[in-house]
Amino acid sequence: MPVIRTSVFIRAEPEVCFDMARSIDIHMESTSQTNEIAVGGRRSGLIELGETVTWEATHFGVRQRLTAKITAFDRPHRFVDEMVSGAFRRFEHEHRFVKENEGTRMEDTFDYSSPWGPLGRLADQLFLYRYMERLLLKRNQYIKDCAE
């Protein structure tokens, strides 16, 4: 099961970073390259504990849907979203926000399993891990740019 970890320093308070990371609107802006839109559940504003959002996006030329639920929430320190349905076998995405010097260290841990058994593991090694890592890094940079 691959685990992607990212970390970025943002010159903003943890509360600002936390709210930007859970903003449906900022998520859609940051993923415009995949035409990602919220089509179900919470569709705008700040997602809360227990809420779901259904995303529709184009990855690898295929329009897909994925529903995630917020399963842990400790503002402004941490929240977790987990896949309810979608293309992965499963995923858990933990977002952490640590006060550091004149800002916040924003850390992501994206723990996932691909479908299709051995073929999914091969896809992870060949391209999926790097693809997902780039999506997370781009999103984090977008949040950083907006917050600063």
Over which residues does each language-model region extend?
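Short, surface-exposed coil-to-beta transition loops
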Residues: V3-R5, R63-T67, R90-H93
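Short strand-connecting beta-turns/loops that link adjacent beta-strands
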Residues: E13, R75-P76, E100-G103
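Glycine-rich portal/gate segments that line the openings of hydrophobic small-molecule binding cavities
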Residues: M28, A38-S85, R105, K138-C146
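Secondary-structure boundary/capping motif
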Residues: M1-V3, R78, H93-H95, L136-N140
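Hydrophobic ligand-binding cavity/cleft-lining segments
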Residues: M1-S44, E48
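Beta-strand/loop substructures that line and gate deep hydrophobic ligand-binding cavities in soluble
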Residues: V80-R134
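Generic structural detector for well-ordered beta-strands
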Residues: S7-R11, A38, E56, K69, ...
